[in-house]
Amino acid sequence: MSQAYSSSQRVSSYRRTFGGAPGFSLGSPLSSPVFPRAGFGTKGSSSSMTSRVYQVSRTSGGAGGLGSLRSSRLGTTRAPSYGAGELLDFSLADAVNQEFLATRTNEKVELQELNDRFANYIEKVRFLEQQNAALAAEVNRLKGREPTRVAELYEEEMRELRRQVEVLTNQRARVDVERDNLIDDLQRLKAKLQEEIQLREEAENNLAAFRADVDAATLARIDLERRIESLNEEIAFLKKVHEEEIRELQAQLQEQQVQVEMDMSKPDLTAALRDIRAQYETIAAKNISEAEEWYKSKVSDLTQAANKNNDALRQAKQEMMEYRHQIQSYTCEIDALKGTNDSLMRQMRELEDRFASEANGYQDNIARLEEEIRHLKDEMARHLREYQDLLNVKMALDVEIATYRKLLEGEESRINLPIQTFSALNFRETSPEQRGSEVHTKKTVMIKTIETRDGEVVSEATQQQHEVL
C-alpha cells in the first residue's frame, strides 16, 4: 500500500513539476515496452519488468499527425493530473531521473534484442522476397513461353496428323475404287469366260457332228470307190465279153463267108454283120460313155462333198485352235488379274494395318501431349497457389513491418522526448498546435487474390488497405 502511495506521490510530484507529456503518460516509469512478436522465437527477459500495452489510434485532424501513444499499467489506476503551474521538487526529480536511467538501460537491452529479431525478420523477408521473385519469374516464364510453345507444337502435330489421315483416307478410297473396278473387270471376264466356254462346247458339239458327217462321207466315198471299182471290173468284163462276142461273130462271119464262097447260092451277110457290129459298137460306146459320165458325176459329187467336209473340218479345227488360244489368253488374264487382286488386297491390308498402327501411335502421342499439358497446368496452378500464398505472407509481413515501424517510431518519440526535456530542463508543455504539425505518411497496400482451378483463373479480387505511418 505504501509503495503504491509513494509511486502515486512520485507521479503526482512529477506531473506537478513537468506536467503531462504531449503524446504519452508516465503512469509506469519503470516498465519496459514489450512488442508483439509474430513469426519469431520468444526470448526471456527480466522478471522485474512489467508488461505495457500500446494502443495506436489514428487521428483525422487537420495536419494528420501521428496517433497518440498511450501507455497504461496493467492493474493500476492513473493518478489524477494536475496543472502545469506547480512548484519544482529537485530531490524528487533526481530520484525520478535515476529510475528513468535504469529504465532507459533496460529498454536499450530490449531494443537491442528487438533489433536483432527485427534484423532476422528482415533477412527472412528478403529471403522470402527472393523466393517470391524467383517463383514469379518461373510463373511468368511458364505462362509466357512453355504453354504457348506446347500448344503450338500440339496444334502443329495435330495438323500434321490430320493431313496424314486425309492422305491415307484418300489413298484408301482410291484403292477401294481400284478394287471395285478390278472386281467389275473380274466379273466381266468371268461372264466372258462362261460365254467362251459355251461357245467352245458348241464348237466341240459341231465338231463332233462334223466328224460324224465326215465319217459318213468317208464311208460313202469308200462305197463309191468300191462301186467304181466294181463298175470298172464290170466294164472290163463287158469289154471282154463284147470282144469275145465280136471274135465269135467274126469267126462265124468268116465261116459263113467261107460257106458263102463255097456255096455261091447263099446270100451275102457281110453288110448285115457290119451293121450289127456297128450297132453293137455304138451301143457299147454309149454304155461306156454313160457309165463314165455317171462315174465322173458321182466322183465329182463325192469329191465336192469331201472337199466341203474337209473345208468344214479345217474351219472347225481353226476355230477350235482360235478358241483354245482365246481360252488360254483369258486364263492367263484371269490368273494375272487374280494375282493383281491378291497383291492389291494384301497392300490394302498392309495399309490398313499401318494406318491403324500409326493412328494408335498418334493417339498415344495425343494422350502424352494432353498429359503433359495437364501436368504443366497443374504445375502452373501449383506455382500460382505458391505465389499467392507467398504474396499473402508478404502482405501480412508488410502489415506487421508497418506495425513494428509505427511502434518503434512511437517508442523512439516517447524515449527521445523525456531526454530532451531533462537535458534542456524545458518544463514547458508542448502545445496541441505543435503536436498537430507533425508530418504523417500514408501507405496504401493492395492485396490481389486470384483463385485458380485446374490451371485456369476462376475468380480475381483486389483489396486495398490504407495505413498512416
Curated annotation (Swiss-Prot):
Cellular location(s): Cytoplasm, Myofibril, Sarcomere, Z line; Cytoplasm; Cell membrane, Sarcolemma; Nucleus
Pfam families listed in its UniProt record? Filament, Filament_head
Resulting phenotype, S32A: Reduced phosphorylation and formation of unusual long bridge-like intermediate filament structures between two daughter cells during cytokinesis. Almost complete loss of phosphorylation
Q: Does the keyword Cell membrane apply?
A: yes
Q: Which InterPro entries match?
A: IF_conserved (IPR018039), IF_rod_dom (IPR039008), Intermed_filament_DNA-bd (IPR006821), Intermediate_filament (IPR050405)
Q: In which tissues is it expressed?
A: Expressed in mature cardiomyocytes, immature cardiomyocytes and cardiac progenitor cells (at protein level).
Q: Which GO terms describe its biological process?
A: intermediate filament organization; muscle organ development; nuclear envelope organization
Provide the phenotype resulting from gene inactivation.
Mice hearts have reduced nebulette (NEB) and elevated actin levels, with intact myofibers showing disordered NEB organization.
From the record, what ranges are coiled-coil?
none
Residues of the region (Tail) are 412-469
- Region span, Linker 2: 287-294
Q: What kind of modification does the protein receive after translation?
A: ADP-ribosylation prevents ability to form intermediate filaments. Phosphorylation at Ser-7, Ser-28 and Ser-32 by CDK1, phosphorylation at Ser-60 by AURKB and phosphorylation at Thr-76 by ROCK1 contribute to efficient separation of desmin intermediate filaments during mitosis.
Region labeled Interaction with CRYAB — which residues? 437-452
The record's region (Coil 1A) falls at: 109-140
- Could you state a single Gene Ontology molecular function term? structural constituent of cytoskeleton
Main location per UniProt? cytoplasm
Q: How does it assemble?
A: Homomer. Interacts with MTM1. Interacts with DST. Interacts with tubulin-alpha; specifically associates with detyrosinated tubulin-alpha. Interacts with EPPK1; interaction is dependent of higher-order structure of intermediate filament. Interacts with CRYAB. Interacts with NEB (via nebulin repeats 160-164). Interacts (via rod region) with NEBL (via nebulin repeats 1-5). Interacts with ASB2 isoform 1; the interaction targets DES for proteasomal degradation. Interacts with PLEC isoform 1C. Interacts with PKP1. Interacts with FLII.
- Family per UniProt? Belongs to the intermediate filament family.
Protein name per UniProt: Desmin
State the organism of origin. Answer: Mus musculus (Mouse)
